[in-house]
Amino acid sequence: MLRVRSHIWQQHRLLSLSLCRKNVQLSSSISNLFEKHNITVTEDEIKHDFNEPILTHLKRRGLVENCVNEEELIKDAETRKLGLYCGADPTAKSLHLGNLLPLMVLLHFNLRGHNVYPLIGGATGEVGDPSGRSTERSAMANNVRLDHINRISGQLSNFFRKATDYGKTRNPEIATLEIGSQELKNNKEWWKDMGMLEFLAIYGKHIRVNQMLSRESIKNRLQSEQGIGFNEFTYQILQAYDFYYLNNTYGVDIQVGGNDQYGNIVAGIDLIGRLRKAEESKNQNQSYGITVPLLTTSNGVKFGKSAGNAIFIDKALTSSYDVYQFMYNTTDEDIKRFLYKFSLLPTKTIDKVVDVHNTDKKSRFGQRVLAIEMCDLIHGDGEGFSNYIISEILFSKVNIKENFKADEILNAFDKQGLVSSVSKTDLASTNIVNLLYKINEGEKSKSELKRMVKGGSVYIGNTKEGKVTDAEYLIDIEKDAIESKLLLLKLGKKYNVVRID
């Protein structure tokens, strides 16, 4: 019955694709930039990605390093609805860019109708995963761990909600498809009532110590001077049981993780097989594992907390503007790789972006697209365009009136809390010195502001033609403001964005 429904779901997917228009309109967040460079997104580009087997597509995007039971998975993913999960332990306040790769795998499957179960390690986080570590993790206070759990749970939920909405703006077909379910889980749910004796009695006999000792992460720690504690040694058992529990309870078929999780994933698949045999289970569906590559730059630099260059997805830790600037500074060699991994633009469209970028690398067109895409993926559609506007005004010296609407500018700076307001009445009777004093809330004295005006450090707009040297100058709304709604003032290196009420 499940396979029949899945076949109908597949037919619906292909039928909806056939209804595409020749040229597809994307969100204004990215289409404005595309139009300037004559880039269009066509029906064929969208079909190309959606007609491709999901695993083949993910490999082409550079999101798959290894796959357990690959041939069976390729067939299964096209004939039935699967369940996938990946876990995140609460070792920090926020997920970071490196954590997004397994989430992107889940997202691609989810947008094609498969169910996903992002998992927060409320229980396993108390133990500590030794994978990829040469030393034992420091103990964490319980209240700190609970705070991390709450934060990361919210981040996981927000990511899938915002990324799904973002996907619909980059590929209109996504809006016509039946997207799979998204259900956040915490493994504390099934571990809190599990006693040690109960676990050993029921499951211990199905776990092989020789296999545990053969894991690379375990061997490395055993050979180290510090060794390994029993808590971290048994972590792989806990992760294996998580996979079994999710498989048995929610029909989760695939575990996704970093490449250092390969051994733990295989242990879970092995445990599922052993327990099914012991329980004489009628469920004969294959279980799978997918690992993602380590996220690095083209010159091999890692991303993450330990590397000291983590870009967090929590706005309180890394603002969306900082995300934009970080991606804007990406090297030319990394643009295609990162767009393939983190953007939901059709891959053929990405190829067009890269081709246009390569004709004039100094324009940094590719970096702008990447920065917009990353912001919209993490923080929601429109976030990237807002940061693009801010960046262009602050650094590119574009003609503001010709390139942006007043409402676009106000919205962009408002998101960063950088907009002041002044009434038309006050504006008409307030000279430039008093205006700057008011909107900067007395940050500088009036005498200091007067010296800056006379010294040529004050501009209206972002061009040299807007220099003001008369301390008694009164703003002319028709001449100085944008659409009579917005006034942009530059005081030294600082910009003031003023809404005219």
How would you label these PLM feature ranges?
Residues 8, 18-20, 29-31, 425, ...:
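Serine/proline-rich low-complexity intrinsically disordered segments, especially terminal tails, linkers
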Residues 270-501:
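Conserved nucleotide- and phosphate/pyrophosphate-binding catalytic cores
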Residues 17-261, 266-269, 276-288:
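NTP-dependent nucleotidyl-transfer catalytic core
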Residues 2, 189-191, 369:
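An N-terminal domain-start capping segment
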Residues 8, 65, 71, 104, ...:
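A broad, structure-centric signal for solvent-exposed, well-ordered loop/edge residues
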Residues 8-9, 24-26, 30, 34, ...:
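Extended hydrophobic/Leu-rich segments
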Residues 1-18:
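N-terminal chloroplast transit peptides
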